A protein has these predicted regions:
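A conserved ligand/cofactor-binding region detector
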Residues: 1-197
């Protein structure tokens, strides 16, 4: 995490350009084992777990796969972020923090039953909520155009609002000290729930 913060600070101080990669999906896979591989620590951790009498595979299988898509484009986006991080290029991946990811399925009496994948039920230790970067997003409503002596003024009226809250996730490239950032946006209601209405 220190190298992640240092690299972000270095990019800001140097004023270098940053690449923004937007995708509706990012199939990153399980972060723990991927990060160990990329840092060259996988075998050392496997051996340390074994020496402590712990089943490394069983423990790594406990991590929920981030439910951030379900197709080839999501895997491609993840590979791009990983590669750009490995190349030590400053990159920010931008996507949606889906509350429920890919569906789970089971077969009951010969019929496929789909269930939601509540991948965030135990939280996500890899993400950092960034409420100070939250923004209002307006949708629906009407657009009113007004011509004034200063030109065209556009006003958005009677819109609905949600609060977009970002969560940052470090993407550690292969044997690098410059992690990329995956910023996932979560939507929250601006209004509190009124139990009395």
């Amino acid at each position: 995490m220190i190298s992640w913060a240092d690299s972000r600070k270095r990019v800001q101080e140097q004023g270098v350009k940053k690449l923004y990669y937007m995708s509706a999906e990012f199939l990153m896979g399980r972060a723990f084992s991927n990060n160990l591989i990329n840092q060259g620590l996988y075998e050392a951790y496997r051996e340390a777990f074994w020496e402590m009498g712990l089943d490394f595979d069983k423990i790594t299988d406990e991590e929920n796969d981030a439910g951030l898509g379900n197709g080839g484009l999501g895997r491609l986006a993840a590979c791009f972020l990983d590669s750009l991080s490995t190349m030590e290029l400053p990159v920010l991946g931008c996507g949606i923090r889906y509350e429920y990811g890919m569906f789970r399925q089971k077969i009951v009496d010969g019929t496929q039953i789909e269930m939601e994948d509540d991948w965030l039920r135990d939280g996500n230790v890899w993400e950092i909520e960034r409420p100070e970067l939250s923004v209002e997003v307006h949708f629906n409503g009407t657009i009113q155009e007004n011509w004034t002596e200063n030109g065209l003024k556009i006003e958005h009226k009677d819109y609905n609002t949600v609060i977009a809250v970002p969560y940052d996730v470090p993407i550690i490239g292969y044997k690098t000290k410059t992690p990329a950032t995956l910023r996932l946006w979560s939507a929250r209601s601006k209004r509190r729930f009124d139990f009395h209405s």
